[in-house]
Amino acid sequence: MTAGSVCAPQIIPLRVPQPGKANHEIDTNTLLEMKSDTPDVNIYYTLDGSKPDFLKKVGSGENNTFKYIKPIALPDGKIQVKAVAVSKDCRQSGIVTKVFQVDYEPPKMVSSEDHGEDALKGFSKQELKNGFVGPKLRKKYKNAENKSTWNVNLRRLADLKVGERADPKTLKDLRFSESPLEIPAYHEGASARLPTHQAQSPGFAHITGQKSLTSTEVMRIQRETDFLKCAHCLASRPSDPFARFCQECGAPVPPIFGYRLPPPEGAQMGLCAECGSMVPMNTPICVVCEAPLAPQLRPQASLYLKERVICRTCGTGNPAHLRYCVTCEGTLPPTQEQWLCNGDEVPRLPTRNGETISCSRCGCQNLWEASFCDWCGAMLGISASHSVCPKCGASNHLTARFCGSCGIYVKSITRFRMNNSLAIVAGGPRPFPEPRSAWQSLNVPLPTPATGSKKDMGTQTSGLFYPSGKLLAKKELEAASHRQRQEKMSDHRPVLTAVSPGRGYWRKQLDHISAHLRSYAQNNPEFRALIAEPRMGKLISATVHEDGYEVSIRLNYIQVSNKNLYLNKSMNLSDHFLSSVTEGGNGLYGSRSSLVSAYSQSISDTPESIKKMKNPKAKSFLANPEPLTPENRLLLEEVGSTGKGRLSVLEQLLDEGADPNCCDSQGRPAVIVAVVNKHFEAIPVLAQRGADIDQQWGPFGNTALHEATLLGLEGRESVATLLGCNANTQKKNTRGQTAYDIALEMGDDLTSALFAD
């Protein structure tokens, strides 16, 4: 423990250890002792589990903190005791917490005969000393055995201490007893002579030296001490003996017995300057003409000092003939603008409708809404000893929260103002009438502005422009016309929709085809490279094929080469058109379903010269000659753009005979289809079932690892999955690039780091 710290208190039950019971199991007759190894400390404790607060003031709410005086007894139940030791210089120790399981045990009662005799002996001396003899009291002591409840309540009342809250039910039982008041006087000396062997109760810890008393004794003590404390908040009774309400909680307090109103004190009489009548000087206004007496009580100075000028910068008084301050050398105001302070007389400011408030320290008249005096800085409206109730005008303590005479809340009222706002707050009429014509307003000549202290000030306006309404309207018209020109010049781009309308809306169908073709070209760099190479002429034929799952649209354009343009020879290209093959020469086939078979059958009859003229890059987009089985088609759909890549569906299709190396209509393997559509979770399933991870596809010969690298950040997870499946990182495409080279070319550091690992 560090030097100067306070030792934590110890909570010890005073009993002999009983076999079969834990240390925390006690009864209601077991006393608890609290002590600390540090000398000269006070111990504060609580019984409801809350933190002990020894700094809480009386009347500030419910107080559950008690000061330890002597061993205490706990009520039955599970009680949590928290204690803290506090030294005289307010150094605190740590808080000690102990939980006791208290069982009810009947109290050990003293026989009624012995108890009555001891009580009679204890109080007979007091009665003889005070000159009172109570025959009724002896009669009550004979029936003490029938009033055990008073003994219990007294046991709780015996240790009551100032600043702690008592049990309201106990006070109620004692306060509303039917026992009459036997002994009218109470002296502390008599109570101090009583034996002191009763334990301290947690609710009352400050009336020491009491033993179990009967109902008559308790009633006498309660009647004689109840007026000293408020029954609701236990705050001290107001010092005013005629106060009817508690100044802390506002509850009614009983009157003091035997007190009468004192005779009125003689007030100082004086002559009113307005009406000339002799009136008391302790009233704010004249009782005859209602003129204010505060200005009349201020003495007039007979000696005057020389004129001086107050510096506006530092507030120093300077002789009137000087032009610069002797302290700060600032420019002094001219003579016609100066404030003159002659002798001890303070300046008087102009008022509104003659309403002013006088300072209690210097007597200066201030504006009615001022909070502090303009001359001495004192707070206005607050006396040095008491505050005034705005409703009844009674004097209360400065810290009083409620008025002792009428009981209204006065905590927020810091000073008294003679206006209607306080009357609204207090809920009553104004305490004083409005000032009449006898109220003299104070007029001070206003200072004239100085002509020599004027300065020309300017502000920068360069660059600031505020357009007019016509100019704003003109700009709006120009912006509208510019938008119209842009709309006319821009190409028509149809809206990209998920499903085309069909049902004969051929224009919307063409817009749908155009929008999706543009989107497909933007997302596929290989297709962009192929579609950008050939030079096409006019569209010569177009066919549409439907097979129940897909819709195939074939467009045939005239291919234009540089040789045909510059030789200017007429060539019969009708035999070399692709439409002659797909459409059967001079006419179309009657059935669209035979289009693929007819094309595959006629391609073998095409001359060798036609085969040489064909672009070898277009073979990747030819239809797959091998028909797809239902399992392979469903597998490609699951890893395609419309699929979800569900592992359970893929495993079921592979179990049913789907080929993991099957290709779609574009010739892409299933692994590459899964990579392009970002179904990276399907790659390990296909690899375990025999899929070729390093299979190349397309005109550039890219593998699945190349395709995943081209996706950038979106394909980073696919790259990690392929590397986990032992994909060949040294595999090169037709351009001689590995997947790592593509990542470096794209500047993708995150993907490059995967290859480095």
Swiss-Prot record:
The keyword Translocase does not apply. Expressed in retina. Its main location: other. ANK repeats lie at residues 631-662, 666-695. It is found in: Cell projection, Cilium. The keyword Repeat applies. Disulfide bonds: none annotated. Keywords: ANK repeat, Cell projection, Metal-binding, Repeat, Zinc, Zinc-finger. GO terms for molecular function: zinc ion binding. One of its GO terms (cellular component) is centrosome. One of its GO terms (biological process) is eye photoreceptor cell development. A zinc finger (DZANK-type) spans 230-290, 359-407. InterPro entries: Ankyrin_rpt (IPR002110), Ankyrin_rpt-contain_sf (IPR036770), DZAN1 (IPR052481), DZR (IPR025874), Fn3_assoc_repeat (IPR026876). SUPFAM superfamilies: Ankyrin repeat. PANTHER family: DOUBLE ZINC RIBBON AND ANKYRIN REPEAT-CONTAINING PROTEIN 1. Interacts with NINL. Associates with DYNC1H1 and multiple dynein intermediate and light chains as well as actin-binding proteins. Involved in vesicle transport in photoreceptor cells. This is Double zinc ribbon and ankyrin repeat-containing protein 1. It comes from Rattus norvegicus. The gene is Dzank1.
